[in-house]
Amino acid sequence: MRIEPGDSFWTKKAMFSNAERQYFETVRPRKTSLPGSTAPNIAAPVTKATKKNKTMAEMMPNKLLYMNPLTMEAHFFLQTLNSVNQTTNPPQLDPHLANLLERIMVGIESYLDRNPTYVLPQEMAAPGEGVAFVQPQELQTIKRTFSCSSCSNRIVGTTIAKAVAHLSEQHPKPNPNNQPVQPHPTHQTKQEKKQAQVKARQHITVRLPKKARAMIVGEITNVFKDKYPIADKLKVIPEYDVIEQDLCKLLSPGFPKQPLRVYKFGSRITGIGNRSSDLDLFVDIGNTFHTFEHRASNATVAKLRAMRKFFCDSEDWRLINFIEQARVPIIKTCHLPTGIECDICLNSMGFCNTNLLKYIFESQPLTQYMCIYVKNWLERCKLTEQISTYSITLMVIYFLQLQALLPPIAMLQIEDAANQAVLVGPWVVNFAQKSFSELGLQQLKATVPVIKGFLRNFFAYFAKFDYEHFLVCPYIGQANVEIAKIERMLHARYSAYVSDNPECSIQLKKPMVVQDPIQLNHNVTKAVTKYGLQTFVDYCQQTAELLEEPSTNWRQRYAF
């Protein structure tokens, strides 16, 4: 039997296992039985996988059998040739067949003219030489199946005669089972593939996670009995004073000529946090409270880098991460004496937002209960990577504004006409803390039926919200605030700031727009993708349907 030289031997490497190829390429020089015949020793790249395959080949040489790829093709050709000779008398020849047979003969001659190395089986070779072949009778176990790509890949038979009959009859019954015809695959760019994936996802309804479903169909009273007391207690605990003192003690030596003050903010301070929530801290170094930076300046980043060194050298603090490239860079650290993780920044906007949320939660407790529930729902749905707690809180506020239960934020803010406005950059950050009776609003009693009813309507509302044309706008607090018109509806201070800083306008060309009610150029959901929004909408729809079902638990009819 003839085989090719070593450099062109494995013409169809995908047909064989990698271990088998490595074995024969390694041992070929000592397997040839003809004197003077040589074959190059092909050295594979020395990798962990290569060494593993070589070891396997040496341990199981009898299980790795050789067969030239042409052997199988020649076997099938001879089968067909013998069948035609037996069934056709006299044999027939057409111009196309004559051309193909001539090309086959020329190909065989070219192959033999290359002086292929002749290899003997082990039983005919000298001891230690020869190759273990696949036995000829094994070829009989391999059968072919022919399918037609023009007929939805329909199987037309296991013999060439049936395949020829199918073609000669011009594809009879091209789609006998009414299967959808698959178009021929075409080359797609990465962008086209991504667009196709996004389009396909839009037609798929994502099922609500089991943990979220269990919370929704379970006793709603348990959610608040477990979460609310903890959240309310975490607003003020002695550990915060210890953290503030230790932080000032740690950082003051690094900035001896600048006043330093620490402000606490975030979900722990507003009353919707839990024991695993981070404590957000704004460190004012050098009276920078009223300084606004759309993105952190080099000076701000330099301060944070200097602060990082103090955390690295401290025995009371453990540095977790330094997120320098974020819009608001933060240092994530853990205060070891209390075990509380802290997010430290040099931006005062978070503290200003927290003051607003505290006022709303205290004036309308229903808001706090709803935010605790949807925060827990968001975590169980694993949506927190794209939709933050602050974002979903603003959505709750906007929804209650539409129910005339909360005032628009614009109504609360004090304009600088009376010289009372507190500004951080161009943004008004203070507001009139009027009672709801002064605002003409009703304060609802937060009972379980009331909370559940508003939660059901909340999820139903945002399941049907037109995110393409409208935005969630707590600043204006009205329904159907159009994305195309929002910038013309804001006060002159916004227009002046954006005119001087065109790159700092609010990002409206996003799948989802939720506007910060204080920093008006900030879309807090700009990170939400189309698929993320579709998932959120699907979850809202399913949650609203589950909350629509009447509760069988008598405890849910009573207040806390």
From Swiss-Prot:
It is found in: Cytoplasm. Residues 169-197 are annotated as: Disordered. Residues 176-188 have a biased composition (Low complexity). Disruption phenotype: Viable. Fertility is significantly reduced. The keyword Lipoprotein does not apply. Its EC number is 2.7.7.52. No activity with Mn(2+) or Ca(2+). Residues 455-522 form the PAP-associated domain. Its cofactor is Mg(2+). Gene3D superfamilies: 1.10.1410.10, Beta Polymerase, domain 2 (3.30.460.10). It catalyses: RNA(n) + UTP = RNA(n)-3'-uridine ribonucleotide + diphosphate. One of its GO terms (biological process) is regulatory ncRNA-mediated gene silencing. One of its GO terms (cellular component) is cytoplasm. The keyword Nucleotide-binding applies. GO terms for molecular function: ATP binding; metal ion binding; RNA uridylyltransferase activity. Keywords: ATP-binding, Cytoplasm, Magnesium, Metal-binding, Nucleotide-binding, Nucleotidyltransferase, RNA-mediated gene silencing, Transferase. Mg(2+) binds at D278, D280. Uridylyltransferase which mediates terminal uridylation of miRNAs, leading to their degradation. Has high specificity for splicing-derived miRNAs (mirtrons) and other miRNA substrates containing a 3'-G terminal nucleotide. Appears to be a major suppressor of mirtron biogenesis. This is Terminal uridylyltransferase Tailor. It comes from Drosophila melanogaster.
